């Protein structure tokens, strides 16, 4: 059960980290647009962009998960 949850989380983070399309911001219309609150789409875009910077750590986590799957969760 725990192994399945760890595998699910790992695959989900991997999917977010390897997305390879352009995530563009909205065009600003004037000086007053800087004061608006960030939308949910903006927050998701920022999260996905931050995942791209952590690809090396995600790769190390994948290696660790493979080790755990063989040693701890294997039969």
Swiss-Prot record:
Cytoplasmic compartment segments = 75
The main location is membrane
Which residues are the signal sequence here? 1-17
Stretches that traverse the bilayer: 54-74
InterPro entries per the UniProt record, alphabetical:
SMIM7
Q: Which GO terms describe its cellular component?
A: membrane
So which stretches are on the Extracellular side? 18-53
Superkingdom of source: Eukaryota
Regarding the membrane, this protein is recorded as: Single-pass type I membrane protein
Matching PANTHER family: SMALL INTEGRAL MEMBRANE PROTEIN 7 (PTHR28622:SF1)
**What does the sequence similarity comment in the record state about its family?**
Belongs to the SMIM7 family.
Q: Per its record, how is this protein called by name?
A: Small integral membrane protein 7-A
Species the sequence originates in: Xenopus laevis (African clawed frog)
């Amino acid at each position: 059960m725990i192994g399945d949850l760890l595998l699910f989380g790992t695959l989900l983070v991997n999917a977010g980290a390897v997305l390879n399309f352009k995530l563009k911001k909205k065009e600003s219309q004037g000086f007053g647009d800087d004061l608006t609150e960030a939308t949910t789409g903006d927050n998701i875009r920022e999260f996905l962009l931050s995942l791209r910077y952590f690809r090396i750590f995600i790769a190390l986590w994948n290696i660790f998960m493979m080790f755990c799957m063989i040693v701890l969760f294997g039969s």
